[in-house]
Amino acid sequence: MSELLLRLNFLLLLLLSCVSPSSFVTFNNPVVGLGACGPHQIQAFTQFKNEFNTRACNHSSPWNGVWCDNSTGAVTKIQFMACLSGTLKSNSSLFQFHELRSLLLIHNNFTSSSISSKFGMLNKLEVLFLSSSGFLGQVPFSFSNLSMLSALDLSDNELTGSLSFVRNLRKLRVLDVSYNHFSGILNPNSSLFELHHLTYLSLGSNSFTSSTLPYEFGNLNKLELLDVSSNSFFGQVPPTISNLTQLTELYLPLNDFTGSLPLVQNLTKLSILALFGNHFSGTIPSSLFTMPFLSYLSLKGNNLNGSIEVPNSSSSSRLESLYLGKNHFEGKILKPISKLINLKELDLSFLSTSYPIDLSLFSSFKSLLVLDLTGDWISQAGLSSDSYISLTLEALYMKQCNISDFPNILKSLPNLECIDVSNNRVSGKIPEWLWSLPRLSSVFIGDNLLTGFEGSSEILVNSSVQILVLDSNSLEGALPHLPLSIIYFSARYNRFKGDIPLSICNRSSLDVLDLRYNNFTGPIPPCLSNLLFLNLRKNNLEGSIPDTYFADAPLRSLDVGYNRLTGKLPRSLLNCSALQFLSVDHNGIEDTFPFYLKVLPKLQVLLLSSNKFYGPLSPPNQGSLGFPELRILEIAGNKLTGSLPQDFFVNWKASSLTMNEDQGLYMVYSKVVYGIYYLSYLATIDLQYKGLSMEQKWVLTSSATIDLSGNRLEGEIPESIGLLKALIALNLSNNAFTGHIPLSLANLVKIESLDLSSNQLSGTIPNGLGTLSFLAYVNVSHNQLNGEIPQGTQITGQPKSSFEGNAGLCGLPLQQRCFGTNAPPAHQFKEEEDEEQEQVLNWEGVAIGYGVGVLLGLAIAQLIASYKPEWLACLIKSRNR
């Protein structure tokens, strides 16, 4: 059972134990239940229900309803899961239920709602669950009035501030504030350490910090679960942790803890110990392998070294999951580990050992289900079919193991469900026997030297494979017919040619199809409207984009850029309400600008560059462009005309400096592949800079870019452009814009790349541009500008080519003097230009990331020219080992 399910069951059992005898009343009809609810309570409940959109409710669910006391008729419990949508206001009828003892409002949609101070009026509450419901801001201090609370769950919201609200909550047994934005230093005198009845405490995935984990945690000696994962704690774990003798689960991962592993030998009830992703050093105490109830141990990603000693008595160990990867152990570690015969999951990935791993040493693991040897040196002899590896094995990961032959060991594994041998040197053809493994569902063999398939084009059809990743090989010829069970298929960066087979239309379970960077020709099959993600970029496809998207089509991402497509943009895309990415750039599509797509509530990326779009870019109402979530707009190289209204940039997503901060670092969609692994979709961007085009992986969720260059736009640049504070790149070059450079550009505090060249702009360059500290590239050449060039560091560091073609400009870096200043020697500019060109040519090896100086600034400044989604098969442990 997963960690999440264990926790949920624990909380629900506690909740049920707090419910007093009462009558249940359905959501639809609060009058049933023998009239248990009083008339005033019925009226208040009806008012509360009407405050929200309840279309998502399962009205027959026993989890959604209200309970009333049999004797008084007062509402004592309200419970709604994944049901309510709207704003929970401070004048809500909810706060009329003064006899409430249990309130469960989880997985609802109270987006942009703060937690009202009125909750403090419900001072008889014993259980309060508000998790996963979109609450934001600080928890009001009035919570300290809820002195009867025994369980409080505020997890998975957008809450901030400190934990001062727990003062006076002395009866708390359960406190979960994980997955929020709580912060600050946990001081020894914090009210948290006065909650001596706590049995469950989760502070994970916040921003708490401390020079060391407070010793006072040792005072909470009734704790059964403690989670401080994914915070900013550092230093050594205090020895007082050994006082928590009731602990069954201890989570300290993804912090900056140092020193030796914490002393847990006294914690004899411990079943889960997660310490991964820290800086622990030294050796592993052998006593860890003899703890009587320990079943899960993750030490992955630390600085542990030395040998591993496992006592002979460990054969009776209950340890089932052991994660030791990414450490620096010495010697032959497999032999001692082989004594842990009850292991089901074993991670030895990226071990820095000087000895090859001999798979025959795994023969003692009779129940092994998952084995991860990614990044290890594997003995070639151990890959033969004579290996003694457990027949129970369900998942085997041998990525980046320098394997040159397809491992025949797989033949003898009838229960194998998931295999990863990607990023090796495997050559030749994929063996026919692979597709006969009866339970095989996920195959990752990308980034090898494979050239084809053994057998006929029908060889895959009857396979049980659901996920197949063949990326970055040398596969050629026609695409084989896919398995009938296929859900996810990626074969990007190969040499497949011919038509996309129509047999794909019979694969009703297919969600993801990624065939980009091949040599496919012919039309796009019209039957792909059921897909979630379709990527056909950089092939030789012809015809039009099929206009076959039905109502509520599930499409999230469509990329058909760099083909030979013609016709119009399909109007049926209006039916794709989940669409986030749309890229049709570099084709021959002839159409007007698709204003109609603004009804798509989730569209973030729109790439139409280098087509034949024509007509006005100004909206019909002469107002804002009106796309609610759009943040990357690339429409360069078309025939769009007209002027932009002053409100064109009003109400754009990029107006917020904190845009998408709650959505993680990268644009990503993940789904479970096998148990503890995920397959992730990551978006990518084509980076355009001075004629150079580079593909960059991992688009930041906080990136906002606009490229309107190479059209026929005219008139003034709207001052409303200054509202887009999250913008990092703006390209309006090669148009016919007139008037002054907007002063509001100085408000673009994140801007890194600004190109206004080849227009008809006049006046001076605003001094405010010189104060933009991230501005790494600016080009205003070939306009009608005059006056002195601002002398900020980011401006004077530009080459003179960025300002030439403006007869009235003067000052550095040009040679024209302003008010008697002397021009620097000519050879200085030559050196600057040579240096800049060298930087540009060296960009391809630069990773995405914010940095200092012109080189890194330029790299990040251009993280935007055109969106290009890419399917990547990422193996990420769900337990965040």
Swiss-Prot record:
Topological domains, Cytoplasmic: 866-881
Entry keywords, A to Z: Cell membrane, Glycoprotein, Leucine-rich repeat, Membrane, Receptor, Repeat, Signal, Transmembrane, Transmembrane helix
GO cellular component: plasma membrane
Subcellular location(s) per record: Cell membrane
Glycan attachment points: 58, 70, 91, 109, 145, 189, 243, 266, 305, 312, 402, 462, 506, 519, 575, 731, 779
LRR repeats: 97-121, 122-145, 146-169, 170-195, 197-219, 220-244, 245-267, 268-291, 293-317, 319-340, 342-364, 365-390, 391-412, 413-437, 439-462, 463-486, 487-506, 507-528, 529-552, 554-576, 578-599, 600-624, 627-651, 701-724, 725-748, 749-772, 774-797
Described purpose of this protein according to its UniProt entry: May be involved in ABA-induced senescence responses.
Protein name listed in UniProt: Receptor-like protein 41
Species this chain originates from: Arabidopsis thaliana
